[in-house]
Structure formats: C-alpha cells, structure tokens
C-alpha cells in the first residue's frame, strides 16, 4: 500500500492577520496557543487530566468529520484513522456518536 506524503502540513487553520491577510497556521500552533492561554489562566494551580481534556477537544471533532467523510462507514473510518473498528466504536460511544 502506498502511503501519501504531503509536501506541506495539510492540518492547517486559515486565519486573518492584523492586515486582514489570510495566513495558514499548522494545527499544532493553534493547539499550542490555546494551551498557553489555558495555562496562563490557572493562577499557579496545576490542572488535572490535562491530557484527556486536550485529547477530547481534538478527538471528538476529528471523529465527527471522519464519520461524515465516510458517510458513517465505520470500517472505512477506522482504516482512515489507523485504528481497529472496535476501538472506533468505543470512541464513538464515548462522545455519544454511536
């Protein structure tokens, strides 16, 4: 099976800069900015379950979009995500999607 090698990071978010120009930023930059903002508001407190919080914020919309893309075909969605179908079903149930 041939693996796709994109020439640029396809996971980008298009935003407008101060000059109203469109700028593509990698998803990771937006996640980093959101985490920086979140952590700055903790006033020295240590968060708990931060990993689960961030994962759920990304995983839920990802599953939603993949299920839409595959028109609900769980086998195809699981293959796209690189997980087995049982794991996909468990994740869909976790987010009330299945």
UniProtKB/Swiss-Prot annotation:
Record-annotated DNA-binding residue ranges: 74-93
Domain of life from the UniProt record: Bacteria
InterPro entries per UniProt: Fis_DNA-bd (IPR005412), Homeodomain-like_sf (IPR009057), HTH_Fis (IPR002197), Trans_regulatory_Fis (IPR050207)
Alphabetized UniProt keyword annotations: Activator, DNA-binding, Transcription, Transcription regulation
GO terms of molecular function: DNA-binding transcription factor activity; sequence-specific DNA binding
Signal sequence region: none
Biological function: Activates ribosomal RNA transcription. Plays a direct role in upstream activation of rRNA promoters.
Oligomer and partners: Homodimer.
NCBIfam families: PRK00430.1 (NF001659)
Family the UniProt entry places it in: Belongs to the transcriptional regulatory Fis family.
Record's protein name: DNA-binding protein Fis
């Amino acid at each position: 099976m041939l693996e796709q090698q994109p020439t640029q990071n396809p996971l980008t978010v298009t935003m407008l800069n101060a000059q109203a120009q469109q700028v593509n930023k990698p998803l990771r930059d937006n996640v980093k900015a959101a985490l920086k903002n979140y952590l700055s508001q903790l006033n020295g407190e240590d968060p708990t379950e931060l990993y689960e919080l961030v994962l759920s914020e990304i995983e839920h919309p990802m599953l939603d979009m993949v299920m839409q893309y595959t028109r609900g075909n769980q086998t195809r969605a699981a293959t796209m995500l690189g997980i087995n179908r049982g794991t996909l079903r468990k994740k869909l149930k976790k987010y009330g999607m299945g």
